[in-house]
């Protein structure tokens, strides 16, 4: 037993170190296969011994759904920051600091040092507080809450792979950080989501406020740590020293930390941060400026709300107020009817905004949104703007928004399910059928070349195509009757439809349009169950064993294949000659296997999605940013700052022709 426990401890230490190298340093020292073998060995030992160490990597993703959030009292207060909207306000803050220091130094023999500031980015995420005990084990994580009392989100934080479950420290500490969702994670999540996320901040906040831990893990959050709020160990003399401690503990930390000795330098750094804002893989909404010397901080002190030794410089907001003119109800391929706000046109972030998201009637009521009212609109991450609230003074002459009782397209009665309304007329409701056909034919699904929404609309209206199976019954003579369909175009579409019959199983599963199932989940299902028959007959218990599949997604898949109409449609597709196949993926040795590659600029022979697929098929890892751990930067026409970064770091740069020659 003792030998097994020692082996477990050894494996846990090794796996945690490998995870740190992979997720934080972006510099793995072993292959994924080697990691998986060690991880599997640990799982077996934990089952045999019935012992699980609290910092074991197997504790990162639990299967449980929590009942509720419990309260947690922070050991050290989490302060808010005062804000400056312009340099004048920042200089006023600086001058106040100078005055206090000057007064102190004039009355004290123990002089304070020259004023020095540290400038960092201000992350637009959710503040978290992580507590490590005297053994260095992560024992609690909580939200900011009131700053004194937060909510326990320990299980949720453990899903963030960059957050260490154990650090090499023997004193109790609380470390403050920001949980964020990267743009890469946001895009990946939305590919599979039935309800796409609207912005990165809501993505992070919603994940940490989710009681279904597997659902939290699906968001693939990241974190940056920047402050020790409580410390029973040796005191820090400067913020620089504190940041070095955080880094040495293996906690993820942003690399941008700049030291400034005057306000001209501070202004220059703020301008730089704002200039790179759009290039970052995450959202920031400003810069944070703090006094470096800890003793000077103590002398400057606090107001009721803020520390006087720190301030946030806020960038121009992506929010504005305008009038809500009307609400338009639209039908998606699942039949869900969702509201869209029609706005009085207004300029926001260099774009004219006329429409905004209103998620559902519950959202409308919660925000008290009414027709004719002035509404606050936010545009984040270049996605569709969202209404965040109303200007209360504008509600007097406004009108209530009425929930629809009939489909705006086919006039069928709507059915309410939870907070959403659905049209169940799947056969003759045009938007549902058209969007289902377009999805089925899309590149990542059945890849029917030359298929468009305009084509789908004509097939529905003129050829009475009412199911995806009907696509395989279309004749060339019928296509010739459609607008802009001549002989060659008609034959090409017939050929493309016929060619799609031989498709890989993952593409077929994705094409079926299962709620909450994107291409990644479809791939994961196929890797787990291998055959269509196995997927059709799987249980919810088996489904939640698939990576990133939680209770909600599992139920969506299970319910989908329980529907007799779905099974009937699948059987009809198979009878019409559709043959989904599955092959175990084998990657031949090539120069890009296990290499980290960044792509910048426009390529002649690949779209951005195609080159990503190609590189992944070669066993490469595609990264969105250049670092010293990048192996290659593939450069096309009009490359961006990533090319300059590669030259600066001495990373190998190749063009498209060199890439093609290497894979011949």
Curated annotation (Swiss-Prot):
The EC number(s) attached to this protein equal 6.5.1.2
Q: Give an example GO biological process.
A: DNA replication
Alphabetized InterPro entries for the sequence: BRCT_dom, BRCT_dom_sf, DisA/LigA_HHH, DNA_ligase, DNA_ligase_CS, DNAligase_adenylation, DNAligase_N, Hlx-hairpin-Hlx_DNA-bd_motif
Q: Give the molecular function GO annotations.
A: DNA binding; DNA ligase (NAD+) activity; metal ion binding
User: What does it catalyze?
Assistant: NAD(+) + (deoxyribonucleotide)n-3'-hydroxyl + 5'-phospho-(deoxyribonucleotide)m = (deoxyribonucleotide)n+m + AMP + beta-nicotinamide D-nucleotide
Give residue ranges for domain BRCT. 587-664
Domain of life of the native organism: Bacteria
Q: Where does NAD(+) bind?
A: 32-36, 80-81, 144, 178, 314
The record's HAMAP family line, in alphabetical order, gives: DNA_ligase_A
Its family? Belongs to the NAD-dependent DNA ligase family. LigA subfamily.
Entry function: DNA ligase that catalyzes the formation of phosphodiester linkages between 5'-phosphoryl and 3'-hydroxyl groups in double-stranded DNA using NAD as a coenzyme and as the energy source for the reaction. It is essential for DNA replication and repair of damaged DNA.
By what name is this protein known?
A: DNA ligase
Q: Which organism is it from?
A: Clostridium botulinum (strain Hall / ATCC 3502 / NCTC 13319 / Type A)
**Gene encoding this polypeptide?**
ligA
């Amino acid at each position: 037993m003792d030998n097994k426990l020692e082996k477990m401890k050894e494996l846990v230490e090794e796996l945690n170190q490998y995870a740190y190298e992979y997720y934080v340093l972006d510099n793995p020292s072993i292959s994924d296969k080697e990691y998986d073998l060690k991880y599997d060995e640990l799982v077996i030992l934990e089952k045999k011994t019935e012992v699980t160490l609290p910092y074991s990597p197997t504790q990162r993703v639990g299967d449980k759904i929590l009942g509720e959030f419990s309260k947690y009292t922070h050991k050290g207060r989490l302060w808010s920051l005062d804000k400056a909207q312009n340099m004048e306000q920042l200089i006023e803050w600086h001058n106040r600091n100078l005055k206090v220091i000057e007064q102190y130094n004039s009355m004290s023999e123990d002089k304070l040092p020259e004023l020095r500031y540290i400038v960092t980015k201000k992350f637009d995420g959710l503040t978290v507080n992580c507590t490590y005990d005297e053994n260095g084990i992560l024992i609690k994580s909580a939200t900011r809450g009131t700053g004194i009392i937060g909510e326990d989100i320990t299980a949720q934080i453990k899903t963030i792979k960059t957050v260490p479950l154990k650090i090499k420290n023997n004193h109790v500490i609380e470390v403050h950080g920001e949980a964020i969702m990267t743009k890469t994670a946001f895009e990946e999540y939305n590919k599979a989501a039935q309800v796409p996320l609207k912005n990165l901040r809501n993505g992070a906040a919603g994940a940490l406020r989710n009681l279904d831990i597997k659902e939290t893990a699906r968001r693939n959050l990241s974190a940056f740590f920047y402050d020790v709020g409580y410390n029973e160990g040796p005191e820090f003399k400067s913020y620089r020293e504190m940041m070095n401690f955080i880094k040495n503990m293996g906690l993820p930390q942003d690399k941008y930390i700049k030291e400034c000795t005057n306000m001209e330098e501070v202004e220059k750094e703020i301008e730089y941060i704002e200039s790179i804002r759009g290039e970052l893989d995450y959202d920031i909404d400003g810069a944070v400026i703090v006094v470096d010397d800890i003793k000077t901080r103590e002398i400057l002190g606090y107001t009721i709300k803020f520390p006087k030794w720190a301030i946030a410089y806020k960038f121009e907001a992506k929010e504005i107020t305008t009038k809500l003119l009307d609400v338009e109800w639209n039908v998606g391929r699942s039949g869900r009817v969702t509201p869209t706000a029609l706005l009085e046109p207004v300029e926001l972030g260099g774009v004219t905004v006329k429409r905004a998201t209103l998620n559902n009637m519950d959202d409308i009521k919660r925000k008290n949104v009414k027709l004719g009212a002035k509404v606050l609109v936010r545009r984040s991450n270049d996605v569709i703007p969202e209404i965040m609230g109303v200007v209360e003074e504008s509600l007097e002459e406004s009108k209530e928004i009425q929930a629809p009782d009939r489909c705006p397209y086919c006039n069928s009665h709507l059915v309410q399910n939870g907070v959403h309304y659905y049209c169940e007329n799947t056969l003759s409701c045009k938007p549902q059928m058209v969007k289902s056909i377009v999805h089925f034919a899309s590149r990542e699904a059945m890849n029917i070349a030359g298929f468009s929404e305009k084509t789908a609309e004509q097939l529905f209206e003129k050829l009475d195509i009412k199911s995806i199976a009907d696509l395989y019954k279309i004749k060339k003579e019928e296509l010739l009757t459609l607008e802009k369909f001549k002989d060659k175009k008609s034959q090409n579409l017939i050929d493309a439809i016929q060619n799609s019959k031989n498709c890989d199983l993952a593409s077929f599963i994705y094409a079926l349009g299962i709620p909450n199932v994107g291409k990644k989940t479809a791939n994961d299902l196929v890797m787990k169950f291998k055959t269509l028959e196995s997927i059709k007959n799987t249980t919810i218990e088996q489904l939640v064993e698939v990576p990133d599949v939680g209770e909600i997604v599992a139920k969506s898949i299970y319910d989908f294949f329980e529907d007799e109409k779905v099974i009937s449609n699948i059987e009809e597709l198979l009878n019409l000659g559709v043959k989904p196949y599955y092959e175990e993926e084998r990657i031949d040795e090539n120069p890009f296997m296990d290499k980290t590659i960044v792509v910048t600029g426009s390529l002649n022979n690949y779209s951005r999605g195609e080159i990503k697929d190609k590189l992944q098929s070669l066993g490469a890892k595609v990264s969105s940013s250049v670092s010293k751990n990048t192996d290659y930067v593939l450069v096309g026409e009009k490359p961006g700052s990533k090319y300059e970064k590669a030259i600066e770091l001495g990373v190998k740069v190749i063009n498209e022709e060199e890439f093609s020659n290497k894979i011949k």
